[in-house]
Amino acid sequence: DTLTAPKISQIVYEVRNADKLDALCRLIDFGSEGTGIYLVFCHTKREVDEVSQHLRLRGYESDAMHGDYTQAQREAVLKKFRDGRCDILVATDVAARGLDISSISHVVNYSIPQNPESYVHRIGRTGRAGREGVAITFVTPREDRQLRLIQSVSKAQIKRGKLPSREEVLGARLTGLEEKINEFIDDKHFDKFLGLADRLLAKLDPKDVEMIVVGTVT
């Protein structure tokens, strides 16, 4: 029998180390349209800081947690994560011990787990409380043997995935944007913005105003 929960979809992507950040961003944009709650595992403190910082620079609500954090800092980060003010938490295995947040929709093994037990423990953070979850693992070609060991010991059903193209990601983002605009219109709370729209149209080309609106909503 498998050691992993049946409601967790497990997918592996072969990715070079240099391409991992781009791969993660594509999957976040394409797979959850900005609604997922992600726990991303890295091996080292330095990698945790770098990944979280790069995600923030790209506009994601990301935070980090590792062994150098004080208890007060750790509690502050976890509160943000639980409250939904941060939807991507990048952490080391040690820092994530005892983490129990049932709303996590995706676990990402940015760095492949060092052993099968770690794999099972990591991905067990999603698919809780009867919910479905997704476990994503990045492997380099040199780590294929390690992946096979994880599969053999855990009996995990891990499928190989293909990263979405940039065009597919853009399509998903535009679909999400359209939904946001429709929700905004349905709320009928935009009367107060009509004066601002008139002032912008008096100074700018309508196409420029459109681009400003799109950039603001996204």
PLM region descriptions:
Residues 1-73, 79-82, 138-144, 156-171, ...:
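Interdomain coupling/hinge region of P-loop NTPase helicase/AAA+ cores
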Residues 13-16, 127, 204:
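Glycosyltransferase donor-binding loop in the core domain
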Residues 33, 131-218:
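Arginine-glycine-biased low-complexity disordered regions
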Residues 52-53, 121-122, 164, 184-185:
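Short, flexible segments with low predicted structural confidence
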